[in-house]
């Protein structure tokens, strides 16, 4: 039900309740001000008397433990106050993780790795944000690992990534995405190349776990891992693989009892598996909306947003100067493979790509690997560019890039199935 608060309206929230609203229309903004009391958005505290602006696509749930008054101005598609909220259970999860962190601190050991799992559209990314914010608010510096290649909470979709969280997320923009550790996968779902997906998850887990020992505060703070919404069949096998790779101490299962019971059966008994309800404010997204969300993430990578716009560069690169590869060769039966190789080895093979018109609109990852003799899969990426034109007559491509020309020396580019139509004026 649409609600027009053009003149502004005050909402009085009782303790342990939340104001939820959604904005679906373009060119609409909603301003929210905390008038009195205490309130938070996904674990980040609102500052009293400060105006917060939300635009199209916003799905907001402002929660209060003690009660508050919020002033809201603008047109929303949905707006209501709810007392039915799982926030108390979520803060209990934070308290349990904090206990593990204190034990790790005393023993000079690594803090807990907590995985958040569940089907699509149950609020996994939101729970990760809440747990990370609560950790930072008590002085921790956790790592945030995102292995959901479909949406991309840290890097653009089609990649796995990790960042260090040192301060609470901004109310309007989330966590700063500075200096992420990013590994190229190149597909929208782990099903695009299951062998490669497990390989990049294992590599990122190895690197991040090793990095914990470099800083005592981060070491005891541990890691929060956000996962894909594919939880059946091979998707479930990927979850088990990630739990082993990271040595998960806790697995928080959102809104699916079947998955909870399967994990109880299959993970070691020292792993704490906890079933949690999803929030009533979680919105189920259509395929079209998920596609739009992916496009928006890629657009923000190149162009930023209204508050912090970026101005990318376009430049031409000749085919002869393009060192372009993809990971994964077409499948062959075992009988056709060289002696000692299996068919699945082809899934991680680095194959040269000949530029053709089919490259148009594809995302390319710029690897830190300098040649294919390096461990390309196990080498992180520096950034991304997009093919905006392919000129077969001139044997050249036009690239959209955050950095000006030229490409770095020995630049090795990795093909991704992700595409972006650059319609930016």
From Swiss-Prot:
One Pfam assignment: Clp1
A cellular component annotation (GO) from this entry: tRNA-intron endonuclease complex
Record bears the keyword DNA-binding: no
The organism's place on the tree of life at top rank: Eukaryota
Residue sites binding ATP per the record: 18, 59, 121-126
One Gene Ontology molecular-function label: polynucleotide 5'-hydroxyl-kinase activity
BP GO terms, sorted: mRNA 3'-end processing; tRNA splicing, via endonucleolytic cleavage and ligation
Family: Belongs to the Clp1 family. Clp1 subfamily.
PANTHER family linked: CLEAVAGE/POLYADENYLATION FACTOR IA SUBUNIT CLP1P (PTHR12755), POLYRIBONUCLEOTIDE 5'-HYDROXYL-KINASE CLP1 (PTHR12755:SF6)
Listed name of the protein: Protein CLP1 homolog
């Amino acid at each position: 039900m649409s609600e027009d608060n053009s003149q502004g309206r005050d909402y009085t929230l009782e303790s342990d309740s939340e104001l939820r609203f959604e904005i679906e229309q373009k060119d609409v903004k909603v301003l929210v001000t905390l008038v009195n009391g205490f309130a938070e958005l996904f674990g980040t505290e609102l500052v009293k008397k400060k105006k917060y602006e939300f635009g199209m696509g916003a799905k907001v749930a402002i929660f209060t433990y003690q009660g508050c008054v919020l002033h809201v101005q603008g047109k929303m598609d949905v707006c209501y106050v709810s007392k039915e909220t799982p926030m108390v259970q979520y803060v209990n999860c934070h308290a349990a993780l904090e206990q593990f962190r204190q034990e790790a601190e005393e023993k000079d050991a690594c803090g807990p790795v907590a995985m958040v799992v569940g089907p699509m559209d149950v609020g996994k990314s939101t729970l990760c944000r809440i747990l990370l914010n609560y950790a930072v608010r008590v002085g921790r510096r956790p790592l945030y690992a995102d292995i959901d290649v479909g949406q991309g909470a840290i890097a653009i979709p089609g990649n796995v990534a990790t960042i260090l969280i040192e301060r609470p997320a901004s109310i309007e923009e989330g966590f700063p995405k500075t200096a992420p550790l990013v590994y190229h996968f190149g597909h929208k779902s782990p099903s695009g190349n299951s062998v490669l997906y497990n390989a990049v998850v294992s590599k990122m887990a190895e690197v991040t776990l090793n990095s914990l020992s470099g800083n005592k505060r981060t070491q005891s703070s541990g890691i929060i891992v956000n996962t894909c919404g594919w939880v059946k069949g091979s998707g479930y096998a990927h979850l088990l693989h990630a739990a082993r790779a990271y040595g998960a101490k806790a697995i928080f299962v959102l809104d699916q009892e079947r998955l909870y019971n399967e994990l109880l059966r299959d993970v070691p008994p020292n792993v704490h598996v906890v079933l949690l309800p999803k929030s009533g404010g979680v919105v189920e997204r259509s395929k079209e909306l998920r596609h739009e969300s992916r496009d928006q993430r890629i657009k923000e990578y190149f162009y930023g947003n209204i508050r912090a716009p970026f101005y990318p560069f376009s430049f031409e690169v000749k085919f002869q100067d393009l060192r372009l590869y993809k990971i994964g060769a077409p499948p062959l039966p075992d009988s056709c493979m060289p002696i000692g190789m299996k068919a699945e080895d082809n899934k991680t093979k680095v194959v040269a790509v000949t530029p053709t018109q089919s490259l148009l609109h594809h995302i390319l990852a710029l690897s830190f690997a300098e040649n294919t003799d390096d461990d390309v899969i196990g080498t992180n990426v520096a950034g991304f560019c997009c093919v905006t034109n392919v000129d077969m007559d001139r044997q050249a491509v036009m690239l959209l890039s955050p950095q000006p020309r030229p490409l770095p020396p020995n630049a090795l580019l990795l093909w991704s199935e992700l595409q972006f139509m650059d319609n930016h004026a």
